[in-house]
Design a protein with these regions (language model features):
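Conserved nucleotide-sugar donor-binding
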Residues: 101-102, 171-182
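Short beta-strand-to-turn element immediately C-terminal to the catalytic PLP-Schiff-base lysine
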Residues: 32, 147-150, 174-175
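Residues that recognize and position ribonucleotide moieties
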Residues: 30, 105, 166, 172-173
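A conserved hydrophobic position in a structured secondary element of the catalytic/binding core
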Residues: 59, 107, 174-175
Length: 184
């Protein structure tokens, strides 16, 4: 289904968790199969006819620009949003405010989301959200019996090898342009 919204891709980070790979390449250009992770993410949005991409760059930005500009066969627009210093997600969103004036996606450049972007957009619109953060469900198991005690140290319960489920930020968002006013 066609949704055709602008997409802000966060490609300015150092990628310290991916070192030593990111000593050579920015994380956006790490290969996943035959393409870079950045191309994989762009392709996932192209399936929904999102054809306008704003890429927030800082670390090794020249490599990212050169690489994307060298792709001759792309049928989408790419605009670069320059972070002169590391600003983080909110800072990059604020910089993009001079280019974006409609509902838009924000995606980290180091995640691959296997979900229906049109359904996420429907949820966002039906909920009348200014910001929708897409969560991933994570599970942790503790391989021991966990003791629950009262304030005096008396045993109340033993939970044997409990499992916990929680939601984490997946790095994919939908925002309304009204959020720009909240960012200093």
């Amino acid at each position: 289904r066609k949704i055709n919204l602008p997409v802000l891709l966060m490609a300015g980070g150092i990628g310290s968790r991916l070192k030593p790979l990111t000593n050579v390449f920015p994380k956006a250009l790490i290969p996943i199969g035959e393409k870079t992770i950045l191309e994989q993410i762009i392709d996932s949005f192209l399936e929904y006819q999102c054809e306008k991409f704003y890429i927030s760059v800082n670390y090794k930005s020249d490599m990212i620009k050169y690489y994307l500009n060298s792709l001759n066969n792309h049928n989408y627009e790419v605009h670069f949003v320059e972070e002169k210093e590391f600003l983080g997600t909110a800072g990059s969103i604020k910089l993009a405010s001079e280019f974006i004036d409609s509902t838009f996606f924000v995606s980290n450049c180091d995640i691959l989301i296997d979900d229906d972007y049109a359904n996420i957009l429907d949820f966002h619109k039906e909920s009348k959200n200014e910001i929708t953060i897409v969560a991933a469900i994570m599970q942790s198991s503790i391989p021991y019996g966990v003791l629950e005690t009262n304030n005096e140290g008396q045993l109340i319960e033993i939970n044997e090898k409990p499992e916990y489920y929680y939601k984490i930020n997946s790095g994919l968002y939908i925002l309304e342009p009204s959020v720009f006013k909240y960012i200093p």
